[in-house]
Amino acid sequence: MRPASIDASGALAGQVRLAGDLRVPRVIGVDDLRTLPGRDVEVGFLCRKSGVRRHRFAGPLLLDVLRAAEPDFDPAERKDRLRFLVSVLGRDGHRAVLSWGEIDPEFGNVPAVLGLHMDGRDLGEHGPHLVVPGDRCGGRHVSEVVEVRVSADDLLWARDRPQT
């Protein structure tokens, strides 16, 4: 099954739409992202054609950006967060999915960053980039992020299940 093609080329440069199962969905600009606490991460990706490539990125944690949009978790149930997926879309249509548990400090604690600087250079309207430290190759590196969608896994479990 081929993935659906998503045309994100019309999205405004330097703007990220936060959508899905959020209490406060919104569009956030690069300037807004700069006001959040920053994190520096160094990554090394094994590229098929050019070998290992190393970069340093700086920007807010994806977790902090999404917490500000108030994901629709059940606050009384600590593990409820583990049902949520985070899908990230780049301007070129490239997509990557992370689990909330992967980036949550109580579980996987992966410091995924929305990078605003790469190797000391401001990405400006070519940012942010999703950067996932620890990934062996750069498949989940998403350039020019235009949308981040948080979704509970309910639809996945409802699909193709026998009706009772």
Functional labels for PLM-detected ranges:
Residues 1-164:
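N-terminal intrinsically disordered, low-complexity segments enriched in P/E/S/T
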